[in-house]
Amino acid sequence: MAKPRKRGRDIDGVFLLDKPQGMSSNDIMQKVKRVFQANKAGHTGALDPLATGMLPICLGEATKFSQFLLDADKRYQVTAKLGERTDTSDAEGQVVETRDVQVDVQDILAALPHFRGNLMQVPTMFSALKHQGKPLYEYARAGITVEREARPITIFDLQFIAYDAPYLTLEVHCSKGTYIRTLVDDLGEYLGCGAHVTVLRRTAVANYPVEAMMNWDTLQVLAAQQDLALLDQHLLPTDSAVSALPALHLNQEQSKAISFGQRVKFDNPTQLTGQVRLFSDTQQFLGVALVDEHNVIRPQRLMTQNT
């Protein structure tokens, strides 16, 4: 008779990992899940194996709110090598084209405004986007190119940091769904020399503080102490995933109704509408709801209440 599968801990929160280079986001997420002995985990937007930086990992009930971090703005620092294009638009790919680089700082500064604002971007073939149920990168590795539709993105800011030819370093503040490799490839084409990513670091997701990140080596040192309570001190609260939403505090009666998934009519002196994060009369995070124009709270995503 097979032994019952061991269940992890019911631990909830968000761990801010400084992802190491060379590991996939899913692989490192599974490692973090094992370190915390969590029963459930999910990351909030994959980073390429080449990339490092902020990777929020949601544990337990926090996985219910991971979509809010997937949808959040991101910030990156990227270094590109001008003069070479690769099939993946980064240093892990094969060089497919080499050109002379006759670009100076003024050329770069003149080009950057063309890549700020609302843009349409065609995703790279080397992406996890799916076509007929299969990731695009599987087609790409088989030498098959699939027609991709351009998708709307927003580059809120694109700043020049340094240029030591042929290496260009930029800072990017962008919307969800932005492929930095594609942005660099497009910029290289605009400059007439081609380019690919050599270094990519995610510096921010939503409003999470950089100083709250922990690298993998430090986490392993903590894990070796076999003190779960010590590890748990490094988790951010579940509601941090939705901190961009306005908070709505409920009384005891309202809290109880919401916890059962019921809609609640309430006095709304501030005329608050749209998505909100809900807190009980005891300051417990209840979840996310929608306040409609009739001052009715409609639950959307709720924490599981212990009974």
From Swiss-Prot:
The record's annotation in InterPro entries points to: PsdUridine_synth_cat_dom_sf (IPR020103), PsdUridine_synth_N (IPR002501), PUA-like_sf (IPR015947), PUA_sf (IPR036974), tRNA_psdUridine_synth_TruB (IPR014780), tRNA_sdUridine_synth_fam1_C (IPR015240), TruB_C (IPR032819)
Reactions catalysed, semicolon-separated, are: uridine(55) in tRNA = pseudouridine(55) in tRNA
Task: Tell me which CDD domains the record gives.
Answer: PseudoU_synth_EcTruB, PUA_TruB_bacterial
GO BP, sorted A to Z: mRNA pseudouridine synthesis; tRNA pseudouridine synthesis
Q: Which molecular function GO terms apply here?
A: RNA binding; tRNA pseudouridine(55) synthase activity
Q: Name one Pfam family in it.
A: TruB_N
Keyword Protein biosynthesis in annotation: no
Q: Where does the source fall among the domains of life?
A: Bacteria
**Alphabetical list of SUPFAM superfamilies matching this protein:** Pseudouridine synthase, PUA domain-like
Q: Which residues form the active site?
A: 48
Q: What is its EC number?
A: 5.4.99.25
Keywords from the named record:
Isomerase, tRNA processing
| Family designation | Belongs to the pseudouridine synthase TruB family. Type 1 subfamily.
PANTHER family to which the protein is assigned, alphabetical: PSEUDOURIDYLATE SYNTHASE TRUB1, TRNA-PSEUDOURIDINE SYNTHASE
Q: What does this protein do?
A: Responsible for synthesis of pseudouridine from uracil-55 in the psi GC loop of transfer RNAs.
Name the UniProt record assigns to this protein: tRNA pseudouridine synthase B
Originating organism = Pasteurella multocida (strain Pm70)
